[in-house]
Amino acid sequence: MRQKGHRHGRTVSPCAGCKLLRRKCVKDSCVFAPYFPAKEPYKFAIVHKIFGASNVNKMLQELSENHRSDAVDSMVYEANARIQDPVYGCVGTISSLHRQLETLQTQLAFAQAELIHIRTLHRIHTKPPPYTASTVTFPSNKDFYSDIDMAVAYTDDAGDFLWSC
């Protein structure tokens, strides 16, 4: 149903809200017009079914204009979720995603623990035999320019040499 008014030689159709409610749409003062265009009637229909036109109107009027678009997007999302899951709505989706996140975090923790275990086993199997001071020969003091005598005392668990002076 088109309005009888003309703008630049063409008829102007009402917004989806006014069309569904069968009322005259004055684009300059209609709170629904910027957010529920005529070419997307399903958006207003689903929001109207779940929240009611009066409640949507009140919610939009209470918000500043820069927050209204986000509010409409949220209402459309919540209305779709309520249609798909009449009992839990979007809370059901949030709970499902939360459980999925917890499962993935648990799997990640197990994978990280397994990686540490494999690295530890690899380090143990590729560890060089421990050296003792008696099996290693060092150059004499005359080969050094200092008075410091250093000897390998032992190796640590990571296979790194520890020196003693």
From Swiss-Prot:
GO terms for molecular function: transcription cis-regulatory region binding. Belongs to the LOB domain-containing protein family. This is LOB domain-containing protein 3. Disulfide bonds: none annotated. InterPro entries: LOB. Over-expression of LBD3 induces a dwarf phenotype. It comes from the Eukaryota. Induction: By cytokinin. Keywords: Nucleus. Coiled coil: none annotated. Expressed in young shoots, roots, stems, leaves and flowers. At the bases of lateral organs formed from vegetative, inflorescence, and floral meristems. One of its GO terms (cellular component) is nucleus. Pfam families: LOB. It is found in: Nucleus. Residues 13-115 form the LOB domain.
